[in-house]
Amino acid sequence: MIYGALGDIEEYRGMLKGLDVLIDWLEENDPAELEVGSHPILGDKAYANVMAPTTRPEAEAHYETHQRYHDLQIDVEGREAFKVATGSLTLVQEFDEKDDYDLVDSDASIAGDLADDKFALFVAGEPHMPTLEFPGDGAQPVKKICFKLLADAYWEE
């Protein structure tokens, strides 16, 4: 996971091809202007999924993992918490190749949030649990963007 202030994202240029594409896009575009839905940035190599969910308690969620895509997530309205699994994993739902995800539970984690213009980049294969209730807020609406960035290993397919 890479976690920091969205305004500092340029520091991560050169790490991942898809991240470089997104950094270039962010220099020219305001993500808050995107409507709910899917928006291509560079075909299926980089795109934005804009969602308007309600945050949920951890007890109602599982960790998700992806094989082909990294997820870079931001909140443009509201705020959410997230967790990243650090312990042993228990499979909850088999991998769905079409939608590139499986669900797992874990016995240990670290936590963060996407308040105050922060971002989190969850790398492919990293179990993460987004869209959790921000501490003390309860369930709240949030407008968020999950930028899907194709992992370098699949870039030339």
Give the role of each language-model region:
Residues F119-L121, G138-W155:
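A short hydrophobic beta-strand segment most commonly corresponding to one strand
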Residues L42-G43, A59-D71, S88-Q93, D107, ...:
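A short beta-loop-beta micro-motif enriched in histidine and acidic residues
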Residues M1-V50, E60-H62:
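A short, N-terminal "cap"/entry segment at the start of jelly-roll beta-barrel domains
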Residues D113-E133:
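Conserved metal-binding segment of the jelly-roll/cupin
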Residues V36-P57, R68-V76, V84:
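A short glycine-rich, His/Asp/Glu-containing loop-to-beta-strand
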Residues R79-K83, P127, A153-Y154:
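Short beta-strand segments in beta-sandwich/barrel cores
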Residues Q67-E80, T86-S88, E94-V104, K148:
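Short, conserved beta-strand element in jelly-roll/cupin
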Residues H70-I74, A111-G112, F119-A120:
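His/acidic/aromatic-lined binding-pocket segments of jelly-roll/cupin-type domains
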